[in-house]
Amino acid sequence: MTRSVVGPFLSRSHLLREPFGRVDSIRPMEPHLLHRVHDSVATVVVRHPAKRNAMTAAMWRALPELLGALADDPAVRALVLTGEGATFCAGADISTLRGSAEEAQLLAVRAEEALAAFPKPTLAAIRGHCVGGGTQLAAACDLRFAEEGALFGVTPAKLGVVYPASATRRLVSLVGPATAKYLLFSGELIDAGRALRTGLVDEVLPGGELDRRVTEFTRVLVSRSQLTQAAAKEFADGRTDRDEHWAAQARGSGDTAEGVAAFLDRRQPRFDWSVPTSG
């Protein structure tokens, strides 16, 4: 199992093979992103306990680079985004965003788009507050599982900020125009039950059950065909112009033959196709 600390930048010198407690003892209060890879699942943890895991400017900048590295890691078949402790992410740490509002928004949009473009399945595991930029990140994931007691809000109207068009479209695609307007116009928080009813989250778990369910579900994800998942992700996200590309990928892979053989043999399939690296 590998754990990394990501501050202003991603550096291989930060790769650690220590439990989280050891990482915390090295840099006890500095906001950063942690990540670990275990059983083919990359888990990215937002850590800023002094500000309820609000994202600093350095963390926004670091996230796209981290995601790029994980996307190119053949050991990674799925990604979980979560917050340390009892909070997912309380948005942006405004005290670290000293440039213009446009510059701050650009950092968040770049991170959001990098997460949305991650070529493997992504899941947000949400406890506590998921507000502002936290909701922006969660919405950019493919799936969202929340613990009872989680609260969700989109709060730019409280700051006089124009919410990005890309984030607005993504929110509307999840909850529909009426609920998106409710959230954007008011900045009010909604509970996990309403988030589930409106489509903002996919599952709500009782207290103490979120980790178990996420582990259980990601185990399913990593056992499935990456070819099927990658094509379905593109099509579901609106890229319907690549039918022939994915047909060629299917013809060149052995996933379909393996899936059929495994079904007939009553065994678990061993799919070989993997997402190509950017290099």
Feature-to-residue mapping (PLM):
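Terminal low-complexity tails and localization/encapsulation signals of metabolic enzymes
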Residues: 30, 261-279
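Conserved CoA-thioester-binding segment of acyl-CoA-metabolizing enzymes
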Residues: 14, 21-84
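Glycine- (often His-adjacent) and acidic-residue-rich active-site loop
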Residues: 75, 83-114, 160
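CoA-thioester-processing core
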Residues: 111-117, 125, 131-184, 198, ...
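Acidic, divalent-metal-coordinating active-site segment for phosphoryl/phosphodiester hydrolysis
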Residues: 188-194
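C-terminal long alpha-helix characteristic of the crotonase
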Residues: 145-150, 178, 201-244, 254, ...
